Amino acid sequence: MNRLAKTAWHRKASKPVTVWMAALVLISLVHWALPNYRWVLIHMFTLGIVTNSIMLWSQHFTEKFLHHQLPEETRPWQLRRFAILNVGILLIITGQLTKDMFAQHWHITAVGATVVGGSLAFHAGYLGRQYLQAKRGQRYAPSVIAYICSACCLPLGALAGAALAAGFPNPWQERLLLTHLILNILGFVGFAAIGSLMLLFPAIWRTQAHYERAPLTFALMSIGLTTAAGGALFGQGLIVAGGLVAYLIGIIIPIMSWGACVVTVLRDPRDRVTFAAVSVAAAPLWLCGTLIVLAYRAATDLGTTAVSLPTMPFLIGFAAQLLIGVMSNILPSNIGGGPKATRTGMLVYDRAGLFRATLVNVGLACWLYTENSWLRVVLSILAMGSLAVFLVLTPFAVRAQLGVIRKTREPLPLAEKPKTNQITAALAVLALVIASFGGLVDGGSGGSSGVVTAGGTGKTTEVALDMKGLRFSPDVITVPAGNQLVLTVRNSDTMAHDLKFDNGAHTGRMNPGEQKRLEVGVISADMAGWCTIAGHRAQGMEMTVKADTSGGSAGGADTVRPTSVHKPTHPIQNGTDDSLEPITER
């Protein structure tokens, strides 16, 4: 049986990854039409793409690391396991898409989570059996242990996710969310990633590295993960931070060895600095940086109830970049056909490689820094689009490699040195984009430009404002003319929002669960406010401040800080209530 026939099962098992990638790109183009679209896009990536990839490649590398090839008659059952997994993923996403349709939607999500968790639990047992049956003393056996730990984490993360879908009163909901992220990103993805990179990093950089402290690395990661997840579940921020630091120390051990690989290659780069190489080097750095940020936030918010989760750096900087970089290298290697054929496939995947790698990493950093909504949109397109190009390149790479194998075309020649001019070009594109939007700093984000706080009646009206379901509640506020308006703004939605007024008062970007105090200024005339996040105003996220010129509440020289209480006359629907009128209590 030839090599292409032997890997037929592998190509079939990888089809769900391709389908989910294509679906993610298409859905992102019309995401505004979906309910809870941010959750849907994130979980299409994490469940659809990442989970299928980890289950496939952990099986692939377990066989390689243990030198124990499974018989071909086991492959049909493996394909059925992928089918079962994807049924569970579809159920989870369906449950969340029907969230606004009926209250018991979480039952669908819970069933899906059970199927997904059960699939990975079985996968962990399957890998464990292979480990026990293999010969002892295999060099990369610790990486197989990492795959088993990875597969054991997802059922626990799925359980936390099902509990989130059911809904628990605070602070349990916030605790479950942080636990869910720690188990799934640091546990499921983290163990699989570090376990694979023990071999793949030096292979992709085409140099040698020592593999000496893998047991210590995985022991520290395990201790850190268990500690952080337990601390998150019980609301102990310092324990979470301590666990994250232990996890960070664990992954720094191999990163130091990988850094030596990079230094060695840069002394004589030749054709070795590619998109895949830069991606697998940058992804662990994003993981380290994000761990530091999350540990700091957990330590400074001891109850963990308001910890802002750095989701995008985890998912894009670490998980997505690592996945695309690794696949750009191992897919041609898996097809095989000799050095020239494999090199041709890799070179096709590396088209504009350094240009794309720069857009991903520098573009993502700028995207996370700026609060300018439309600039964030453009930068996100550049960063994620540079990764999505993988889908376009795949058929060309496969066709070119098979052409060399079948001797219908010549192999592509090696480059003599890295194309560093691509880095310059990418930086120039980013600089042009940023300059066209007036720079990274949004001039109106400070909340003070143009705001008048002196004069008027000397009195202050304070109002609590909620943002949820692409609406402000209340969306009309009446304030005595001459009073200063101070808002306590809370984002109770599942996506980021902000609030900006005609006079320049601006909350800045607010993540879900965040709360800010905004001094709007003295109200002398009616004034409009809106959410500046791209597309939100067009969907109706606007409000009005009306100046009451009747004079009934004016007068008095002393500063009074009343509290505005909003009493609805009918049940609130979708987080809004047009009947709310401020009642000033002195």
Where are the model-predicted features located?
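Hydrophobic alpha-helical transmembrane segments of multi-pass integral membrane proteins
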Residues: 1-451
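Extracytoplasmic/periplasmic beta-strand context in beta-sandwich domains
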Residues: 42, 181, 311, 497, ...
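Beta-strand-rich interaction surfaces with strong enrichment in secreted/lumenal proteins
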Residues: 71, 474-477, 505-510, 518-519
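Extracellular/periplasmic metallocenter environments
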Residues: 447-455, 510-586
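N-terminal edge beta-strand
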Residues: 455-484
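Short beta-strand/loop motifs in extracellular/secreted proteins, especially
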Residues: 485, 495-498
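Asparagine-centered strand-capping/turn motif at beta-strand->loop junctions
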Residues: 489-491
